[in-house]
Amino acid sequence: MAVFDWPASLVPKTVTIRPPRRTLGLSTSLTDFTQVVPSIRPPFTLTMQFDALEGLDVLAYRAVHASLEGRANMVRVPLFDVWYAATQAQIMGGTVTHSDGTAFSDGALYLTRDLSGVLVSGVQGARTITADFGSYGQLLQAGLYFGLGEHPYIATGVSWSGSVATIRCSPSLRRDYDTEPLRLRPTMIGRLPDDDNGALTLESLRYGTPSIEFTEAFDGPFS
């Protein structure tokens, strides 16, 4: 079972991100209402619809779809929340040293592609976490996605005390975290919901407008 990265060249036209939402029905009450409770940590799902693919994009899509081998393999796909998440300029406002804590000879540091040093600890099942964003400022608000490891979450409520955010999240924490880096460019490990999903039909034998769906996978640890 393999995990590969979604190619950066294939950007969908429309994206539907469905957050965890599964409920379980309980017994019917005396007033004929059925009580429901949330299922414990159900998966995210992601549907991507593409504009007309042709040329090299058709070949890239074919290669990705074939690499999935039905539901046998998984893909690491970004959530494509580019208009609402923190900008790359804001994220790259952070800098880091070499692994031994030293800088370059002229004092320069590395720029980061995501947050650096924003760490989260929590136990499985927790709904609320805290994180100190330091010099990054207040980059997270309710409605934004974030990542802990390979797991995406959505912030349902955020309150700030200086640079420290108290974040209510959905779903509840999928596992225990010990100083896990918080990411504002989250990805999701997903697999097809069925073997035939995402098939590419070529119109005029040349171009196609495929749609593909992924369900979050929990087969970790991923490598």
Which residues fall in each region the model found?
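Extracellular/virion structural assembly segments
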Residues: 1-223
